[in-house]
Amino acid sequence: MQQPFNYPYPQIYWVDSSASSPWAPPGTVLPCPTSVPRRPGQRRPPPPPPPPPLPPPPPPPLPPLPLPPLKKRGNHSTGLCLLVMFFMVLVALVGLGLGMFQLFHLQKELAELRESTSQKHTASSLEKQIGHPSPPPEKKEQRKVAHLTGKPNSRSMPLEWEDTYGIVLLSGVKYKKGGLVINETGLYFVYSKVYFRGQSCTNLPLSHKVYMRNSKYPQDLVMMEGKMMSYCTTGQMWAHSSYLGAVFNLTSTDHLYVNVSELSLVNFEESQTFFGLYKL
């Protein structure tokens, strides 16, 4: 069987994996020249088209993402605790500083007080040694007041009063023969209370008065007076009290007394019958 010569022989390709060519990449298939001589005037067939370029190699795999630090939350908590401790220490130091400042201030005041006391004591000692006595202390004004209570053995007029025992009081005022003697001019509140009682009521008129004696007046001057009538039921046991009190402008050497109409009916208990005054 003969093959027509107007057709070229099929081309044969060979691959040499060990040979390398500067014009072809490794593994390129090269055509093998045919051993059949070509005819005169026959065109050489065009070379085969170059093979398509190989795809680029795949990119290398990405490195694994770093894991988040496990102790980040713990570090935040630790930092917060340290900040709180810092503020606590700062507050403690500030308090300690304030306390030390107050202590220093108190010590300074105490030292100044001791120094002033020492200076006063030294000055007083020097005055005593030199012979200059210190000024006498100021005397407080004596309060003018008197409170006298009934005297059971009183048998005459004016009434006599207890001025020594019991709840009596005398200050800045003198007591003389049943009367209070004023030694300083001024406003005084004068008061007197007399307690009357009896086994059988006779409704005798009763009077109770406070009067004043002074050499400037020719006779006694009645200051206060109380009268009682129809104060009990006839034939029955009874008791009645009379109280007098008012403000007067008294002068020195005035003498005040108390008089009653029925001395035998007076109860002289200190809580029931009394006489007194005090300066306003």
UniProtKB/Swiss-Prot annotation:
SMART domains according to UniProt: TNF (SM00207)
Transmembrane stretches, start-end: 81-101
Name of the protein described by the UniProt record: Tumor necrosis factor ligand superfamily member 6
Cysteine disulfide partners in this protein: 201-232
First-listed, main subcellular location of the protein, grouped into a coarse class: membrane
Comp. bias regions, Pro residues: 43-69
Gene encoding the protein: FASLG
UniProt cross-references to CDD domains, sorted A to Z: TNF (cd00184)
Organism encoding this protein: Cercocebus atys (Sooty mangabey)
Residue intervals on the Cytoplasmic side: 1-80
Purpose: Cytokine that binds to TNFRSF6/FAS, a receptor that transduces the apoptotic signal into cells. Involved in cytotoxic T-cell-mediated apoptosis, natural killer cell-mediated apoptosis and in T-cell development. Initiates fratricidal/suicidal activation-induced cell death (AICD) in antigen-activated T-cells contributing to the termination of immune responses. TNFRSF6/FAS-mediated apoptosis has also a role in the induction of peripheral tolerance. Binds to TNFRSF6B/DcR3, a decoy receptor that blocks apoptosis.
One annotated GO biological process: positive regulation of phosphatidylserine exposure on apoptotic cell surface
Cellular component, GO annotation: cytoplasmic vesicle lumen; external side of plasma membrane; extracellular exosome; lysosomal lumen; nucleus; plasma membrane
Membrane topology: Single-pass type II membrane protein
Domain THD: 144-280
Residues exposed to the Extracellular side: 102-280
Pfam families given in the database record: TNF
Family of this protein: Belongs to the tumor necrosis factor family.
Cell location: Cell membrane; Cytoplasmic vesicle lumen; Lysosome lumen
Keywords: Apoptosis, Cell membrane, Cytokine, Cytoplasmic vesicle, Disulfide bond, Glycoprotein, Lysosome, Membrane, Nucleus, Repressor, Secreted, Signal-anchor, Transcription, Transcription regulation, Transmembrane, Transmembrane helix, Ubl conjugation
Sites where a glycan is attached: 183, 249, 259
Molecular-function GO term, any one: tumor necrosis factor receptor binding
Annotated stretches, region: Disordered: 20-70, 117-155
Organism classification: Eukaryota, Metazoa, Chordata, Craniata, Vertebrata
PROSITE patterns, A to Z: THD_1, THD_2
Residue(s) at site: Cleavage: 80-81, 128-129
Domain of life from the UniProt record: Eukaryota
Entry comment on modification after translation: The soluble form derives from the membrane form by proteolytic processing. The membrane-bound form undergoes two successive intramembrane proteolytic cleavages. The first one is processed by ADAM10 producing an N-terminal fragment, which lacks the receptor-binding extracellular domain. This ADAM10-processed FasL (FasL APL) remnant form is still membrane anchored and further processed by SPPL2A that liberates the FasL intracellular domain (FasL ICD). FasL shedding by ADAM10 is a prerequisite for subsequent intramembrane cleavage by SPPL2A in T-cells.
Assembly notes: Homotrimer. Interacts with ARHGAP9, BAIAP2L1, BTK, CACNB3, CACNB4, CRK, DLG2, DNMBP, DOCK4, EPS8L3, FGR, FYB1, FYN, HCK, ITK, ITSN2, KALRN, LYN, MACC1, MIA, MPP4, MYO15A, NCF1, NCK1, NCK2, NCKIPSD, OSTF1, PIK3R1, PSTPIP1, RIMBP3C, SAMSN1, SH3GL3, SH3PXD2B, SH3PXD2A, SH3RF2, SKAP2, SNX33, SNX9, SORBS3, SPTA1, SRC, SRGAP1, SRGAP2, SRGAP3, TEC, TJP3 and YES1.
